[in-house]
């Protein structure tokens, strides 16, 4: 339900949508950072609005309340959108049970104010964007007035931030220092944890500060911070404990650390975006899962020389060695490519460590994202954290449950055939399970749930009883039985923002949980199932707009019963590799392929039909109404979310590395991309050249075209020119995901040459074109 701020009685000014003030703060270049509480926020005291002064453009007789409302809702770059003013009125229900539109604010003062403010901001922007603001963000009311109720001259950002006190979710009340939206703040962002074999040291992999912090396991004092490569993701110890391995995803390297000297002794090249890393028990081989190249690199553990690559599933990321060391299990964050509009399917790739060959592929039907895997000490139970989307039906009626089922798949001698069980409860979801740990005595399974910001605790004997006491479904899954978890989930322990990796101490009495977006480690007493202490990692205490936006992106607290958040569909801020039918476009209409979020800035409008002009429109009331079905963002939370998304960087392009020349195939592909005549000498119209629609640094001219790919269930034929940023990674393709490969865009879905002139190209020439596209 849209939030609206009512104007003073009798004024006829607009009821405003929740996105309005947020947009003003986004485009102002600085934002104050309130933190969303995990509990229901109490109704604030009514605000008072001082009489405005220095009204040079607005009507002179406006009250403070009226000026405040106008400033909130006006943003020139949005243009004149009907629903900015004419919102649904919940107090005025029509004959079919739907709220009528509110036309009470269609008044002369409002129109006069809008015209004046549009003219003013348009004049300012002509010079401001060209000479002052390199970010390309337009000026709005909030640029100068920065949240003040009185009209006054612009104040520099350093002096304009207002002191605020907010309550951090699950934490204490404290003042939050302000940071400008674009400030780079060096947070730690702990991602994975690991104890040394003797239990005396705790290794903390910090993704944002790009280091391993070595803590004394008794006092938690820092022994040393060890710098590693860019955006580290995986960490593991050699069997002897004398070497620590860290994967660096943006460098495609592996850092080797001597645990005696705590120094990096070697850096070895591996595959594209290395994630998990494990050394086998013999010390002969290192295995590295590469998320982008979808394979596992096998290295000589002594020299780092690569011996072979083993084909894995899509998005190979996390590794777990069986307790006997004979098998290595690989999980994948993206589903394998499948026929259009079929249920997703991932896999667990099983590798024989002695021979370094793929032994088996365990299918995970209906599963999209798969994360950590763990074994009991005796090897008789294997557990993997995953989630199971229901994407073949319209994403509607979230209150009925089951659109993202958070599950575990169990296998092993104690389980029998693999079986999927849900973690969700009837009124509380265990959103996005990530880390898994099993107690040494096999009595408990612990799962970190990123979106729910909690650790779920499972009683293993009760779980096994549940599995064996019931007839097994033919599908091998109890995923949609929301009553099932009551049989084995015994605790849900609140922790910090975005809990990820965790580890038990040697006795199993303490569970350490890395809270990535809070720079803390929660220490859970496993006997009482409560947080006994919290380690606060050294680093900045400022909560920047980007940091708060990232917290908002990864939490599921806004979704009905905590079911979903942004990161459900955009895994690690990217995409999920599946297609959806979203309710706003109509049931069964406009099937859409999920887009990559990185590098979005400068590619607006959004949606495949170009229906949303900017990120606040994309992520504001529309998202709250159709996806969350519950709590709304406050104005500044929406602002910070948009700031975070707009500032997501693009990862290194493996097909066009800095300092490298194009390959001959890429050069030939570029010539095809920019050509203006076909192979028969016929001119290609400007509108049918690749380089016209896909121009500019992001590979889009941001316009709508009919490229002949629409389907009977689409609401229109015009589609926005898709950006080419990271196109090599984002299969499937086209607006509805019907093309599984780049080649299919032209070989299957371009019979009339409406999507570029390509039917004169040979197979080899299409390959050249694709090689060039991958460089974008």
Which residues does each PLM region occupy?
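N-terminal secretory signal peptides that target proteins for export/translocation
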Residues: 1-10
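Bacterial N-terminal signal peptides
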Residues: 12-28
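Extracytoplasmic c-type cytochrome modules immediately beyond a signal peptide or single-pass transmembrane anchor
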Residues: 26-170, 516-532
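Predominantly soluble domains enriched in secretory-pathway, periplasmic, or organellar proteins
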Residues: 31-36, 97, 119, 155-553, ...
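Periplasmic c-type cytochrome electron-transfer domains
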Residues: 72-84, 90-92, 176, 192, ...
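Short microdomains enriched in Cys/His and/or Lys/Arg
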Residues: 103-124, 162-181, 270, 586-602, ...
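Long, charge-rich boundary regions
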Residues: 123-146, 152, 181, 605-620, ...
């Amino acid at each position: 339900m849209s939030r609206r701020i009512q104007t003073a009685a009798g004024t006829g000014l607009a009821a405003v949508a929740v996105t309005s003030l947020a947009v003003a703060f986004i485009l102002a270049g600085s934002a104050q950072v309130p933190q969303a509480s995990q509990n229901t926020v109490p109704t604030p005291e009514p605000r008072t609005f001082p009489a405005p002064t220095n009204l040079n453009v607005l009507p002179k007789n406006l009250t403070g309340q009226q000026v405040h409302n106008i400033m909130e809702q006006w943003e020139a770059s949005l243009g004149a959108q009907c629903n900015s003013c004419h919102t649904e009125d919940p107090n005025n229900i029509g004959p079919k049970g739907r709220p009528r539109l509110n036309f009470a604010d269609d008044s002369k003062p409002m129109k006069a104010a809008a015209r004046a403010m549009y003219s003013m901001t348009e004049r300012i922007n002509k010079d401001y964007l060209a000479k002052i603001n390199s970010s390309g963000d337009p000026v709005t009311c909030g640029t100068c007035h920065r949240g003040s109720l009185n009209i006054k001259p612009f104040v520099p950002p350093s002096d304009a931030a207002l002191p605020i006190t907010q309550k951090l979710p699950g934490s204490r009340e404290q003042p939050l220092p302000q940071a400008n939206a674009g400030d780079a703040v060096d947070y730690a962002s702990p991602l994975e944890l690991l104890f040394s074999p003797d239990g005396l040291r705790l290794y903390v992999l910090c993704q944002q500060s790009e280091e391993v912090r070595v803590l004394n396991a008794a006092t938690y004092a820092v022994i040393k911070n060890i710098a590693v490569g860019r955006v580290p993701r995986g960490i593991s110890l050699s069997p002897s404990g004398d070497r620590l391995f860290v994967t660096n995803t943006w460098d495609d390297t592996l850092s080797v650390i001597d645990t005696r000297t705590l120094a990096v002794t070697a850096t070895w090249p591996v595959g594209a975006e290395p994630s998990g890393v494990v050394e086998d028990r013999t010390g002969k081989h290192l295995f590295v899962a590469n998320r982008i190249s979808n394979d596992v690199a096998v290295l000589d553990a002594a020299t780092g020389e690569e011996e072979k690559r083993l084909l894995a599933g899509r998005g190979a990321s996390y590794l777990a060695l069986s307790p006997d060391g004979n098998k290595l299990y690989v999980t994948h964050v993206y589903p394998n490519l499948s026929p259009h509009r079929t249920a997703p399917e991932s896999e667990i790739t099983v590798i024989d460590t002695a021979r370094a060959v793929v032994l088996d592929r365990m299918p995970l039907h209906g599963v999209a994202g798969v994360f950590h895997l763990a074994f009991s000490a005796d090897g008789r139970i294997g557990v993997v954290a995953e989630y199971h989307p229901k994407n073949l039906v319209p994403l509607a009626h979230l209150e009925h449950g089951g659109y993202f089922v958070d599950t575990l798949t169990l296998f092993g001698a104690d389980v029998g055939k693999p079986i999927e069980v849900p973690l969700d409860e009837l009124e509380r979801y265990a959103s996005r399970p990530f880390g898994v740990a099993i107690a040494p005595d096999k009595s408990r399974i612990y799962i970190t749930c990123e979106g729910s910001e909690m650790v779920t605790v499972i009683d293993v004997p009760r779980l096994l009883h549940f599995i064996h006491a019931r007839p097994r479904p033919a599908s091998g899954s109890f995923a949609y039985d929301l009553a099932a978890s009551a049989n084995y989930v015994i605790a849900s322990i609140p922790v910090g923002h975005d809990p990820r990796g965790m580890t038990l101490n040697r006795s199993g009495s303490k569970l350490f949980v890395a809270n990535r977006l809070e720079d803390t480690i929660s220490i859970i007493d496993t006997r009482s199932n409560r947080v006994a202490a919290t380690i606060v990692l050294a680093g900045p205490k400022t909560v920047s707009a980007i940091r708060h936006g990232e917290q908002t992106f990864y939490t599921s607290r806004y979704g009905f019963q905590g079911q979903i958040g942004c990161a459900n569909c955009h895994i690690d801020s990217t995409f999920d590799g599946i297609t959806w039918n979203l309710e706003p476009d109509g049931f069964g209409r406009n099937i859409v392929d999920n887009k990559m979020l990185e590098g979005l800035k400068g590619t607006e409008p959004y949606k495949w039909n170009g229906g949303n002009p900017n990120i606040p429109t994309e992520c504001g009331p529309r998202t709250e109404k159709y996806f969350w079905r519950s709590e709304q963002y406050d104005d500044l939370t929406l602002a910070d979310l948009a700031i975070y998304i707009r500032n997501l960087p693009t990862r290194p392009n493996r097909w066009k590395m800095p300092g490298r020349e194009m390959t001959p195939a890429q050069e030939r592909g570029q010539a095809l991309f920019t050509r203006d005549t076909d192979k028969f000498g016929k001119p290609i119209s400007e509108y049918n050249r690749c380089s016209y629609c896909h121009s500019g640094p992001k590979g889009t001219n941001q316009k709508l075209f009919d490229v002949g790919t629409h389907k009977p269930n689409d609401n229109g034929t015009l589609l926005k020119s898709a950006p080419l940023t990271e196109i090599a990674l984002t299969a499937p393709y086209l607006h509805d995901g019907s093309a599984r490969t780049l080649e299919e865009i032209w070989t299957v879905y371009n019979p009339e040459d409406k999507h570029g002139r390509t039917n004169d190209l040979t197979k080899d020439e299409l390959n050249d074109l694709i090689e060039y596209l991958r460089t974008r």
